[in-house]
């Protein structure tokens, strides 16, 4: 298996409900190491830049409004097959369809307030990590 990095956001709805520790425990229980982490409060410009690929979609403004509504936790996760493993751990975007025991089935309130974000490919992981972290902020844990 390949050791890879992926990017994760714990969204404002989950931060507000004090779920950071519970979600971090899920990462570690799944064999994913947290190699970078920080709390940030996105402004509109930063959120719009991060979600630029969705700019033409009807939900874009609501997404930006939500992501700027409170602090978020951004982190880099590392492990074997980290991107796929984290996607499975998150569950589907719609928590009503998420498998039992996934982060979204257990913590998400709705499709809009779905608690977490995760990269969907190696390319998006690299782009998203670089958007929030410098190389010096990532601390490999061998």
Curated annotation (Swiss-Prot):
Its recorded reaction(s) are:
a 2'-deoxyribonucleoside 5'-diphosphate + ATP = a 2'-deoxyribonucleoside 5'-triphosphate + ADP; a ribonucleoside 5'-diphosphate + ATP = a ribonucleoside 5'-triphosphate + ADP
Q: Which cofactor does it need?
A: Mg(2+)
Q: What GO MF annotations does this protein's record show? A: ATP binding; metal ion binding; nucleoside diphosphate kinase activity
Task: Kindly state one GO CC term assigned in the UniProt record.
Answer: cytoplasm
Which positions in this protein are listed as binding ATP? 11, 59, 87, 93, 104, 114
Q: Where is the active site?
A: 117
Q: Which domain of life is it from?
A: Bacteria
Pfam families xref list: NDK (PF00334)
Localization per record:
Cytoplasm
Query: Keyword Nucleus: yes or no?
Result: no
Kindly state which keywords UniProt assigns to this record, in alphabetical order.
Answer: ATP-binding, Cytoplasm, Kinase, Magnesium, Metal-binding, Nucleotide metabolism, Nucleotide-binding, Phosphoprotein, Transferase
Enzyme Commission identifier(s): 2.7.4.6
Q: Which GO terms describe its biological process?
A: CTP biosynthetic process; GTP biosynthetic process; UTP biosynthetic process
Provide the function of this protein. Major role in the synthesis of nucleoside triphosphates other than ATP. The ATP gamma phosphate is transferred to the NDP beta phosphate via a ping-pong mechanism, using a phosphorylated active-site intermediate.
Subunit note:
Homotetramer.
Cross-referenced PANTHER family, in alphabetical order? NUCLEOSIDE DIPHOSPHATE KINASE, NUCLEOSIDE DIPHOSPHATE KINASE DDB_G0292928-RELATED
Concerning its family, UniProt says: Belongs to the NDK family.
Task: From the Swiss-Prot or TrEMBL record, give the protein name.
Answer: Nucleoside diphosphate kinase
Protein source organism: Photobacterium profundum (strain SS9)
